[in-house]
């Protein structure tokens, strides 16, 4: 684990570079990857675009030469998040609850061992959607780095409050200690430009803020 941890700075720089490229794509369309358009002409950017750009950056980065990756990787554990179509108030883990394997959005392998688990989200979905990914990442048994990466179309003070609640006041599952959060906003209204959403766990209470990127 200590060896893999040494890659944290390079990984987080890779996430930032991926976002910067996606931001350029969103404002200029000068890339082979196009932003899909709604009927009204507005662009629709999701976690899929960010994941795609990240994979391209990962494959071209010399630091990760020899590493491999897999998409929608089945989880080691069995999980149950819903009963019928209703979210469970308490998520279940293990084979005794009638659950099934979940999927990890992206897994990176060093020496053919799962070393980095990544979940991508976009546009601030609900507490349940966040909590489900937090629970899944927290409980996967392999000794790997774990990231929750979220893309926001735009942010303001109200959005920041909503993000904070979903990360730290989530009744389904809060952001675990063993999971790193990286958030990116294509346009922060206060900063008037793209921003990284930064979590500081060293403060009490934990602080969250937008910073220019």
Locate each region found by the language model.
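Charged, often low-complexity linker/regulatory segments
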Residues: 1-59
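Hydrophobic, Leu/Ile/Phe/Ala-enriched alpha-helical segments that form helix-helix packing faces
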Residues: 18, 22, 26, 54-62, ...
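Active-site metal-binding core of divalent-cation-utilizing nuclease and nuclease-like domains
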Residues: 42-43, 66-112
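Acidic-residue sensor for enzyme active/binding pockets
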Residues: 47-49, 72-74, 119
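Conserved catalytic cores of phosphodiester-cleaving nucleases, focusing on short active-site segments
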Residues: 106-124
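Active-site-adjacent loop/helix micro-motif of nuclease/hydrolase catalytic cores
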Residues: 116, 124-135, 157-163
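Hydrophobic beta-strand segments of well-ordered beta-sheets in folded domains
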Residues: 116-117, 143-152
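Domain-level recognition of nuclease-like catalytic cores that cleave nucleotide substrates
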Residues: 151-213
